[in-house]
Every structure is written in C-alpha cells, then in structure tokens.
A protein has these predicted regions:
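Secondary-structure end/capping motifs
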Residues: 141-225
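Conserved C-terminal helix/tail region of periplasmic/extracytoplasmic solute-binding proteins
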Residues: 215-241
C-alpha cells in the first residue's frame, strides 16, 4: 500500500510551430485550431492525454487521424502521432506538441525557425496539471515519520537549488546520473539544460494535502477521456500527523 507525498512535476509540454504561426492563448485557441493539423509526440501516452484534455476543456472537436499528408477541410482539429524527427519548421502540421528539454533544443537547432507558440500548462489553467507524483510505502511512512518529513523538505528545497544562479547545469546532470542504473544516461545534457529549460519543466513540490483536489480533478478528466475509472481514496493522500 502506498501513499502520495506530493506532486513534483506540473507539466513540461509546449506547442511548437513555424515562426509565422500565431501563438495559442486561452482566448484564441478554439478559433485557431478549427481545421488545423496537430502533430503530437506519444499520442497514446501522457503527452497525448494532456493535449486532448486541454482540447476538451475548450470544447474543441478533434479526431485522431493516420494519413499525415491529407488536408483538413473540416472544423475539427486533426491529431497525428509523430516522431521527434518529424517536428520541423517545414512539417505539414499547424502545431506540434513536445516536452522540455527537447522543445528548447528544437528551437535552438532550427535557429528560431521553429518557435514555442503555446504553453499546454497555461492553456490547461489552474497552475498546470499534476504530471508526476511522489509516493512512499504506507508502512515505511508510519515507521519513519521524521525521515519522511525531512525528505519532503529536501525535495521542496531542491526546486530552489535547480534554479539557483550558483547551480551549474553540469552539477544537475551529474546529480541525476549518480542515481540512474548502470549504463543509463539522463535525457538532457549540460549544453541543453538552461535555467529557462528547468523553469519550463515546472519542477516544484506541492504536498499531498494542498494538491489533492487538483489531482482528483485531473484523474476525473483522464477517466472521461479514456473511458476508464481513475480515482484515489482520501487515504492515499499523506497528511503529516
């Protein structure tokens, strides 16, 4: 049995498009996505789920499609699963969805011909959606209350350390690498891990008590989207004694 200690990531997904495309905002997204084509990494995983939840929030009709060369002559948004190498300034998609740090790397490598044209977290609202949570075994929590309190404090402070001017990118990369299995490497490097990228990853710790309602809301939205029930009992959310 596990309990959730808190949320540690609040969304790192962004909208990319050619420089000439208009940026997506809460006020214009329904109109701009009419008849559009959207390329999305990991369409049948979290990235695609988050995109579709945002579209549902704005009552935007959409359809998952396979033929990437087709025109869209409807009022719906057509969504396609794409690979990372398909996200280019000359792609046939109006907008493309990807995650940091790949987003900033794409922008830099195309010399700004590809630009960030929307923030999926901002479009979702509510200070982003809960993308990753921290859990611990219930019996471990019960037997190690002080350790859990100290650990949660350290996790919260770590967000500040990541963004501190005195923290070098190489330090962050090494800190992550030190905790990976042998042979595994981080998905980012000291070259592409800027302070802006770290900030865009929305890494911060919100305790379970303070983010419970946000998590429940997002689970309900996932349930509606996928036709399955995702829920968490009150006992799942850790509250310090």
């Amino acid at each position: 049995v596990y309990k959730m200690l808190g949320t540690v990531t609040h969304g790192n997904l962004y909208v990319l498009a050619a420089a000439a495309q208009e940026s997506l905002t809460a006020s214009n997204i329904p109109e701009l996505l009419k008849g559009s084509k959207i390329g999305c990494l990991q369409l049948n995983n979290f990235v695609g789920y988050a995109l579709r939840i945002v579209l549902d929030r704005y009552d935007i009709e959409y359809e998952v499609r396979q033929n990437k060369e087709e025109a869209n002559d409807t009022d719906k948004a057509y969504i396609y699963e794409v690979a990372a190498n398909e996200i280019t300034p000359t792609a046939s998609y109006d907008y493309m969805i990807a995650a940091e740090p790949a987003v900033s790397t794409k922008v830099a490598n195309t010399q700004n011909k590809l630009q960030v044209k929307g923030d999926l977290q901002e479009l979702y609202g509510e200070n982003g959606y809960p993308q990753a949570v921290l859990v611990a075994k219930a019996d471990f929590i019960e037997e190690n209350g002080q350790f859990i309190a100290d650990f949660m404090q350290a996790v919260a402070e770590n967000a500040g350390w990541l963004l501190a001017d005195t923290t070098e990118a190489a330090e962050v990369v090494q800190a992550v690498a030190d905790h990976l299995p042998d042979g595994a490497t981080p998905s980012f490097t000291a070259e592409n891990l800027t302070k802006e990228v770290i900030e865009n990853c929305a890494v911060r710790f919100d305790g379970a008590a303070s983010c419970k309602e946000r998590v429940n809301t997002f689970l309900a939205e996932l349930s509606d989207l996928l036709g399955k029930t995702f829920s968490a009992a009150d006992a799942f959310y850790y509250t310090a004694e």
